[in-house]
């Protein structure tokens, strides 16, 4: 069964909402999808840093959303519910569009004024936000294995980037990226809550044009004096962010979030900095350090504990 086929199609609304009671514990499909997203997300901070000298942060967010529309639309068209949203649920779309614009714009701004390595740490606080909110709002059960796995994976991230954190940076930029990570966590739980009413792919497709309008309005108001340049590196970086990150990652992650428990899925997000640092080590032919090995081991152990936490629970039909 593919992720597209796995998306629920019948419930209390014709747009295919997801019942919390039908959220599943992690399985091989969830882990494979999360690995894909984290691998592509791993290069996002570097891609943002590569282009911010040519394109202002808020404008960059708007452009990448424009590029992502065909990918998101194609994936949504392949789901059973396609683009349907009931009229009474359309009020959710602009709220999610605002969330999307604010989260990506703040990440871009913080990364442009800080360091990509530090951004990869502070943006990945979102699992620590999702876990308590998913218990409180979504009534998910988080077992001791999942909590231990969450702590292990987060410790692995700290080990991976300890040197970058100690090297210093712009505190204001760090705070902005930290807030972006918190926004992503809140947004994830709110999305999961809304999936009772609206299918994941439909919501993502319709919220994206709203985010585009907000970003272009924001760049007009706040970045009117910023320079816009066109370079080969900037074009490649923007295409990567639009197609791979906003297109593929956002679509796959939304479908995963609609099917699986938010807290367990969010913990897998700690793999993102591991992929980013490993990719940088490979590209630049850097030596494999003890911190990379230890960090990878802690993250891997954390992901394993999270994946097996609900294994004995009956999977809903």
Named regions from a protein language model:
Residues 2-62, 98, 102, 106, ...:
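Glycine-/small-residue-enriched transmembrane alpha-helix faces in small-molecule transporters
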Residues 39-69, 115-118, 186-211, 224, ...:
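Juxtamembrane helix-loop-helix junctions in multi-pass membrane proteins
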Residues 59-70, 100, 108-141, 146, ...:
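Specific alpha-helical transmembrane segments that line the substrate/conduction pathway
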Residues 40, 44-45, 73-123, 131, ...:
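Specific transmembrane alpha-helical segments of multi-pass solute transporters/efflux pumps
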Residues 20-21, 50, 54, 68-86, ...:
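Membrane-interface helix-cap regions at the ends of transmembrane helices
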Residues 61-63, 119-125, 190-213, 243-282:
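Helix-helix packing/entry segments at the starts of transmembrane helices
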Residues 5-6, 72, 94, 133, ...:
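Hydrophobic transmembrane alpha-helices of multi-pass small-molecule transport proteins
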Residues 25-31, 54-62, 85-90, 162-183, ...:
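Juxtamembrane helix-entry segments on the extracytoplasmic side of multipass membrane proteins
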């Amino acid at each position: 069964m593919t992720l597209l086929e796995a998306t629920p199609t019948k419930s209390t609304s014709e747009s295919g909402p997801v019942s919390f009671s039908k959220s599943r514990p992690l399985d091989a499909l969830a882990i494979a999808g999360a690995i894909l997203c984290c691998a592509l997300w791993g290069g996002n901070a570097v891609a943002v840093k590569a282009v911010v000298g040519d394109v202002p942060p808020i404008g960059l967010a708007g452009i990448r959303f424009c590029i992502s529309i065909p990918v998101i639309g194609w994936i949504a068209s392949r789901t059973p519910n396609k683009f349907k949203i009931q009229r009474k649920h359309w009020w959710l779309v602009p709220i999610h569009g605002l969330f999307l614009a604010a989260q990506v714009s703040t990440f871009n701004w913080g990364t442009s004024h800080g360091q990509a390595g530090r951004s990869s740490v502070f943006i990945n606080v979102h699992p620590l936000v999702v876990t308590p909110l998913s218990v409180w709002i979504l009534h998910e059960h988080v077992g001791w294995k999942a909590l231990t796995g969450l702590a292990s994976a987060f410790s692995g991230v700290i080990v991976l980037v300890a040197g970058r954190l100690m090297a210093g940076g712009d505190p204001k930029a760090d705070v902005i990226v930290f807030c972006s990570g918190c926004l992503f966590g809140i947004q994830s739980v709110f999305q999961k809550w809304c999936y009772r009413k609206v299918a994941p792919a439909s919501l993502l497709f319709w919220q994206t044009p709203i985010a585009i309008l907000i970003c272009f309005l924001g760049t007009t108001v706040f970045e009117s004096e910023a320079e816009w340049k066109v370079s080969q590196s900037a074009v490649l970086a923007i295409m990567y962010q639009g197609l791979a990150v906003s297109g593929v990652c956002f679509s796959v992650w939304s479908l995963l979030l609609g099917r699986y428990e938010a807290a367990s899925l969010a913990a897998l997000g700690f793999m993102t900095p591991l992929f980013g640092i490993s990719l940088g080590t490979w590209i630049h032919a850097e030596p494999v350090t003890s911190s990379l090995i230890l960090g990878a081991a802690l993250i891997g152990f954390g992901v394993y504990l999270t994946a097996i936490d609900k294994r004995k629970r009956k999977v809903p039909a």
